[in-house]
Amino acid sequence: MFDLSDVAYLSSEAGAADLARASTYTFSAGTLVADTAALRNEFGDHAAVLAQTVQLRRKAAAKLGRVDHWLFTDDALQQATPAAVARHRAARLAGLVVHDVTCSVGAELAALDGVAAAVIGSDIDPVRTAMARNNIGEHVLVCRADALAPSSRAQVVIADPGRRAGGRRRFDPSAYSPPVDAVLRSYADRDLVVKCAPGLDFADLREQTGFDGEIEVVSLDGGVREACLWSAGLAGARRRATVLATIGTGYQLTDADPDDCAVAGAGEWIIDPDGAVVRAGLVRQYAARHGLWQLDARIAYLSGDCVPAGVQGYRVLDSLPYSEKRLRQALAARDCGAVEITVRGVDLDPALLRTRLKLRGSVPLSVVITRIGSGAKAFVCAARSPGGTRTPDPRSA
């Protein structure tokens, strides 16, 4: 735990010098006890906050980029928006005056600085606001304030309610801190952006809160990161999927995009769309964009004769009505020794099924198991491969 005196020390010249010295320690699993003891001998009562800060900075680098001088708490770092996601949001708010009312240690402020016309940050936690001042600098106003008590006249308010309690995630938006419905009421007269967990029931959220703006689901490098509520004045659609990549380009889909797609049997490839597309309910729009079709109208798996660029697909080698015995026989016939199993719409645990299959061959394969109509079907596929490639049939290799 950090207090204000810790922040004052760590942000001072003496603290910076001590952090530079502490950063020479590895704090690996094998050296942690010895490093901590050495730090305690050298820095006494400051040893704990020095060790924590060095380790948090190392953990933060992959998520936030260059944070050599930043200060964090562990909880603040866990909830901090990844830099790529924050930059995407900032771009949508370019040229506006923005107030982040749950600014924490300043990850969103850093992305907004220089993009928005002006930026204000506030948080109820005095330690986090002190850290944000250190992290962002004096040119951005950061103050202590209750997120539910409007304290500026900024055009746009951003809120990122706490979604953890006692180390556990909260899935009910009314249990967030502050609750989502309270945030919506407090800023009903402003343009508002609210970050939420991507696993929310969006229909239920709209019904309970009356929210009528855009719900954007964002993924980064294949992992779904957040759902973001954009009030009507900022909305460009009802539903949006934003797929971001650390390297390369991403894409967006909305419910305004064409959604004409057929339901048909499997073609050469099966494609599992990005999680943001699935959570945003835009599978049909994705299929229409790439000339794909659905295997079942209720299931997110798509099929086609080619794989969209930058996406990994499963090349179909065989298909059969699902039964564990028949699947084991089909895999054995192809000398399968390792298998990736993905499942949709069928009550199966892939890890347990993989163990029960008892494969003894040498060829890596993939299996896609899905509900189609009233039954389940298994597709034996070549090992997953990226778009633009054609994987040879393992039996002919």
Regions found by a protein language model. Name each.
Residues 1-397:
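SAM-dependent transferase fold signal centered on methyltransferase-like domains
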